[in-house]
Structure formats: C-alpha cells, structure tokens
From Swiss-Prot:
Annotated organism of origin: Arabidopsis thaliana (Mouse-ear cress)
GO molecular function: ATP binding; microtubule binding; microtubule motor activity
Biological process terms in GO annotation: microtubule-based movement
InterPro entries attached to this UniProt entry: Kinesin-like_fam (IPR027640), Kinesin_motor_CS (IPR019821), Kinesin_motor_dom (IPR001752), Kinesin_motor_dom_sf (IPR036961), P-loop_NTPase (IPR027417)
UniProt binding sites for ATP: 215-222
Domain Kinesin motor: 132-456
Low complexity composition-biased segments: 602-611
Family, similarity comment: Belongs to the TRAFAC class myosin-kinesin ATPase superfamily. Kinesin family. KIN-14 subfamily.
Cellular component, GO annotation: microtubule
Keyword Coiled coil listed: yes
Name of protein: Kinesin-like protein KIN-14S
Length: 765
C-alpha cells in the first residue's frame, strides 16, 4: 500500500517523490534491521496468530529494489525534462539552422538538375559515338531435336571479349564477327535488357528509338522481343522501365504513354488493337506527315497508366497476330509485328514539351522454301516475308554505300521504318542466330547482314519537339512575318505621306511667297494707278474750258446735218462698247475748225497718263444721240435766237479686264476708221464721255456700269429712249478680284465742272 502511494506521488511530480524518498529509505533501513534481527534471533520466534514473518521481509526487500528502479527512472525523466528546457532556449538557433538547410536543399536541387542534364548530354554523346545503329548478336542454345539429330554448335565465344564471335565454316575455317555486344546461349532476358535499357531511356529525353529483331525462322526473335509470362521479353521490360523512370522524374517532368500495335501481313497493314467486329477491317496506309515523319492514320492508340494495362494490351495483340506451323518452327510468325509507344513529356520547370516514339519490331524470319516445306497459303506468306526482308536488305545496302536514292517505298515495312533506319533515330538491332551446323548458311547470311547494318552512319539523333507546339510555333512565326510585312507597308505609307506632306508644305510656302509678292505688286500698282488717275483728273479739269468753247462752235453745224455713218466697207464690225476715244485722223478741209494746239495737248496728256499699248485697246464703239426735232421755219424767222436741241449721249461701259489694271485712261488718238472723215472725228470728239466719269468706281456685282450722273448730285433721266449696242464677250477675272476690296479712288466729276457744263447748255438754249 505504501509502495503504491509512493509510486503515485512519483507519477504526479518529481518534488513529492524526492520529499518522500528519505522517509522511505529510513523505513526500509529500519525494516531491514528488524528483519535481520529476527533472522539472527532464530526461527523460533513465530507468532501463532500472524504466522511466519520471513515472507513479509522478502516483500519489503523486493519493494526496496523497485523503489531503486523507480528512482533511476525518475532521474532519467528529470534529465530529459532538463534537456527539453535547454532546447527551448536554443529555438532561434534551430530555426536559423532550418533556414540554412532549406537554402542548401534548394541549391542541391538546382545542382542536381544541372548534373542530370549534363549526364543526359554525356550519355547521349556516348551512344552517338558508339553509333546511331547499334547491333547486338544473340545466339540461342541447341534444342532437343538438333541434339537428337547430332548437330554440332558452330558458334564459338570468347569470355574475355564480349563483342566478338567466331563461326566455324564448312571448310574448318573460322570467320570473325564483331558487334556492339554478343550474348551467349546461357544469357537470360535480364542480361539482354540490361544492355538494352540505356538506349530505351533516351525516349524519355525526347529522342526517337527503334529496336528490332532480325534472323532466320526459329532463332528466337519472338522470344527476345515478347518472351513468356514467366520470362518476359524486351517489350514488356521496356515499358516497365519507362513507367519506373517517369515516376522517378514526376517532380520534374510529366509523361503520358500510349501504345499502338500493328502487323504487316502479305504487304497489308492490320491493326491488332482494334475491337473484333463483324465489319470488315479498315484499310490502313502509310502517310507522310507535315513534319516529314511516317504515320498510319486511323491506327488505334490506347493510353496506358501502369504495367498491368500494358500487359493486357500486349496479350490482346499477340492473340490475334498471324502465326502458323512450318517444318522449321511449330509457332512461326507469319507477319512483321510492330509495337509503337508514344511518349509525350512536359517539363514542369520551363514548360518545354516533347513527343517521341519508341518502335519495338519483331520481324518475321527469313525462310528457304525448299527447307521449310511449305505450300499453298504458307508459301504465299513466305514469299511476301522474303520480299519485305529483301527490300530491307536493299535499304541497308544503299545506306551503307551512301547512295543518293534509298528505296524505302519498295515495302510497307521499310516505309514505316524509314525514320528509324536513316533518320534522326537511335536504332538497336538484335541479330538472332542458330548455333546448329544445319543452319550454317542462314547464320552466315544473318551475320553478314548485321555487319552491313553496323556500318551505317546516319548522323546524330536529335530531340523531337511536340508536333502541336511546333505547329503553334510555325503559326506564330507566320503571323509574326505577316505582321512585319504589314508594319513595313504601314511604315512605307507613313514615309510616303511624310514626303508628300513635305512637298505640299514646300509648295504651300512657295504659294505663300507668291501671294505676298502679288500683294506687294498689287499695292505698287494701286499706288501707280492712284498717281495716274490724279494726273488724269488734273488734265481733265484743264481741258474743260477748251471743250466748252468747242461745243459752242460746233453745235450750230450739228443741228443742220446729222453725222453720217462711215461707209459699210470701211466700217468695223460691232464690238463691245468701250470708254476709249477713237484716234483722230488729220483732216485737210476742216483743219481750221480745230486748233492744232488742242489736239497736241490732248495727245500729250493721254500719252503721259497711259502706260499700256494704245493700239491693243482701241476698239470701235457706237453711241446714241437724242435731240429735239427742228422747229418750223416761221418760228425760226420770228426768233432772233438760235434754238439748239437738247442732246445727251448715253454710253454703256464694260468693266476693264484684269490685265488692263495698270492703265485705265482713254487714248487721245482716234481710231483709223475716223481719220478719213473729219466730221465723224469732230462728233466723236464732241460727244465722247469724260474720262473721269467712265472709270468704274468699285468692283460691284453688275457687269456693266451706268451712265455717269449729272452735276449737282441729282439723278438725271433722258427724255428720249437710249440705245445700247453690246457684244457679249467672256471676261477673265483676276484671282485677286475680291482681295482687299476698296472703292475706286477716281472721284466723280466735281460740282464745278458739272455746273459749268450745265450753264453752258442753258445759255445755248
């Protein structure tokens, strides 16, 4: 009871256990002493009620031993607690250490990736140095039938040389053959796959790989490639290794595996994974893809996730493969079986994708028709098998001799293996031979063929990018090229527009300069015109008095006779009515009426005021004169005064042409048509309008100007109708027509001159 309490106290806490330790020890020591005294005193002291005391002492001793054990355990627990307390004090150091380890782990992972990529590169380089097409030779052991027939082995192997083989020929000579590796008859499937595994794993790195077995019938090709459920061959072991490698690289790469299986039977392609149905099999053909690889459209491609699924597919395909019995082999393959494994990989770090193929080919054996004793359907199969193998031999010979043309299309088999034999593919060939002396000829043929294959140099293999990614890249490249072309076109258009804009700006600046020059010229011409008009006004005012005197002298003569028109032949055709004076012809009969000084003054003043050629501006004009009929003779006789009719000349003037802006004065010389008739010249001189009045005041909307107004500022209407003779003519306007429109600076006839003319007419009446 006391022990249990002590144990409970010890379980509750170390302090209570330590406090009770002394009392327990004292109690134990007392008990031990009492027991010793009792024992030493002898066994005679026995209590009849309690019985013997020896078992109690033994129990006490046992309890003391247990207490010691508990004490040791307590000390151990105390030490652990103390260590935990010490660890809690160094927690920051632990966190720092963890961070350091994490950093080192990241660096190691990065270094691992670099080393892994370097290992892949070096490994692939070693494979390429050995040759893209590697040849392994495998010799099967003698079977029971051959041993029973007394056939000897003609193959000799050197244990020190793993890649050499000697064949004893019929003349007792030895022929040496050298390959990448030679497997002896006692080598198992594991040994064979151990040498095959390095090239198989290249498919995970993005390389195309092809493994095929060649040899005569009955040499173990199907056993090497397919194997048995107990001793599986290369096909199953290869897929198993691919799954194992893909799982080990799952943190770096993501892989997807799919399997297709077909056979070439009598030069016809047959899908071995298609579901059996009553429908006839679909015809399959070899086609070349856009990337240059050979594909079989319509072929079933089953995705696999583990080795069990792979084995189920392989058993399904092997079950429907064409197999027949011959004299050489009871289970002879009558077709070429091809297993294609498609591996799609994606790098989880940089996103790079690959798509590669692994071809596992079990070729049908070459046969001698006479030896295998076949006929009928088997004979036809043998002929097709030998034909396809002969085409394969032609391809190998062409590749070895490096001819320009390789006859891949001579057979469906060689057409499908085109990339594997002469392309960027890593190829491995198993040449299967028989050691029997009865098959010596076929063995030598197979070994010679394998030697030619080993001598082929097809160049280094390269990685296969994913077709979908390649197509996307091509589309993006084409789109980029198209965009570059469009950008170049737009840039050319922009440059041409900039050139055109520069040319337009240059033209605009030139036109602006021309406009400024024209404005300057116009301003100068206006100044010149103002000066000329000022001089013309001064000249007109000086000649007003002379004109009044001439009117008084010539009016009586005009009343008596109407001025005749010029003869028809001499008359000029009617033209536009102008405000220019006709030139005066010299007259012999009436030269005294008009003073020479008057004509000279007028001519001199007109010549000074005009700056343009007079001959080009003089044109015939027509005037209309209105006058009152003459009175009766009695009225004339009774009147002492001479009654003069009221007359007025109405003239329609046309706006001057833009080219005639430099000078608007009327020439003083009369036209040539009036030179022969002095009276016409007199009337033209008499009734010609004043130069100051016929000059237009401003550029108005009307094409013609009215007759000049009378003096006094009041409008005057004629009492007789006015006749206007016009001739329509197109007028060319100046582009500066409405530029800075200003009224004419020519003043209307002054009131002084107007009043003098009206007073003169009133006195004459």
């Amino acid at each position: 009871m006391e022990r249990d309490q002590h144990q409970e106290i010890c379980n509750d806490g170390g302090l209570l256990c330590e406090s009770k330790e002394v009392s327990v020890n004292n109690h134990n020591s007392d008990a031990v002493e009492e027991s010793e005294d009792t024992i030493t005193s002898g066994n005679q002291e026995v209590s009849p009620a309690n019985g013997p005391t020896l078992p109690i002492l033994q129990k006490i001793i046992d309890c003391s031993d247990k207490i010691k054990i508990l004490k040791d355990e307590h000390a151990l627990v105390s030490n652990q607690v103390q260590e935990i307390k010490n660890c809690s004090l160094v927690e920051p150091e632990i966190s720092r250490a963890l961070q350091l380890l994490t950093t080192k782990l990241g660096a190691l992972e990065k270094q691992y990736l670099e080393e892994s990529s370097e290992r892949k590169r070096l490994y692939n380089e070693v494979i390429e140095l050995k040759g893209n097409i590697r040849v392994f030779c495998r010799c099967r052991p003698l079977n029971q039938a051959e041993i029973a027939n007394g056939c000897a082995s003609v193959a000799e192997f050197d244990t020190t040389q793993e890649n050499e083989l000697q064949i004893l020929s019929s003349d007792s000579s030895k022929k040496h053959f050298k390959f990448d590796h030679v497997f002896k008859p006692d080598d198992g499937q594991e040994t064979v796959f151990a040498q095959t595994k390095p090239i198989v794993t290249s498919v995970l790195d993005g390389y195309n790989v092809c493994i095929f077995a060649y040899g005569q019938t009955g040499t173990g090709k199907t056993f090497t490639m397919e194997g048995t459920p107990e001793n599986r061959g290369v096909n199953y072991r290869t897929l198993e290794e691919l799954f194992r490698c893909s799982e080990s690289k799952s943190h770096l790469m993501k892989f997807e595996l799919s399997v297709s299986m077909l056979e070439v039977y009598n030069e016809k392609i047959r899908d071995l994974l298609v579901d059996n149905s009553n429908q006839p099999p679909k015809k399959l053909e070899v086609k070349q893809s856009a990337e240059g690889t050979q594909e079989v459209p319509g072929l079933v491609e089953a995705q696999v996730y583990n080795t069990d699924g792979v084995w189920d597919l392989l058993k399904k395909g092997y079950a429907v493969r064409s197999v027949g019995s011959t004299a050489a082999n009871e289970q002879s393959s009558r077709s070429h079986c091809l297993l294609r494994v498609t591996v799609k990989g994606e790098n989880l770090i940089n996103g790079q994708r690959t798509r590669s193929h692994l071809w596992l080919v079990d070729l049908a054996g070459s046969e001698r028709v006479g030896k295998v004793e076949v006929e009928g359907e088997r004979l036809k199969e043998s002929q097709f098998i030998n034909k396809s193998l002969s085409a394969l031999g032609d391809v190998i010979s062409a590749l070895a001799s490096k001819t320009s043309h390789i006859p891949y299309r001579n057979s469906k088999l060689t057409h499908m293996l085109q990339n594997s034999l002469g392309g960027d593919c890593k190829t491995l060939m198993f040449v299967q031979i028989s050691p029997s002396s009865a098959d010596l000829g076929e063995t030598l043929c197979s070994l010679n063929f394998a030697s030619r294959v080993r001598g082929i140099e097809s160049g280094p293999a390269r990685k296969q990018a994913d077709v979908s990614e390649l197509l996307k890249s091509k589309q993006m490249a084409e789109k980029l090229k198209h965009e570059e072309k469009e950008t170049k076109k737009l840039q050319d258009n922009v440059q041409s527009l900039q050139l055109r804009l520069t040319a337009r700006e240059h033209i605009c600046r030139g036109l602006q300069d021309k406009v400024r020059d024209l404005e300057f010229q116009l301003a100068e011409e206006r100044k010149t015109r103002i000066k000329q008009e000022s001089r013309a006004l001064a000249t007109a005012s000086s000649t007003t008095t002379t004109t009044s005197r001439h009117l008084r002298e010539t009016l009586p003569t005009i009343i008596e006779k109407k001025p005749p028109l010029a003869p028809t032949r001499m008359r000029m055709p009617l033209r536009r009515i102008t405000n220019f004076m006709p030139q005066q012809q010299p007259s012999q009969g009436h030269s005294k009426r008009f003073s020479d000084t008057t004509f000279k003054e007028n001519n001199n003043s007109n010549r000074r005021s005009s700056s343009m050629d007079v001959n080009t501006l003089m044109k015939p004009r027509r005037s209309s004169i209105a006058f009152r009929p003459a009175p009766a003779p009695s009225a004339i006789a009774s009147s002492n005064k001479t009654i003069m009719p009221r007359r007025r000349v109405s003239i329609a003037t046309l706006r001057p042409e833009p080219s005639s802006l430099s000078s608007m004065e009327t020439p003083s010389r009369p036209p040539p048509s009036f030179r022969g008739d002095p009276r016409k010249a007199r009337y033209s001189k008499l009734f010609s309008p004043d130069r100051n009045l016929v000059t237009p005041n401003a550029m108005k909307s009307s094409r013609f100007m009215k007759s000049p107004l009378g003096g006094g500022g009041s409008s005057w209407k004629p009492s007789h109708p006015t006749v206007i003779a016009l001739q329509k003519k197109a007028v060319v306007w100046s582009p500066l027509k409405f530029k800075n429109r200003r009224p004419s600076l020519v003043a209307i006839r002054s009131s002084a001159s107007s009043s003098s003319a009206s007073d003169l007419l009133r006195r004459e009446q």
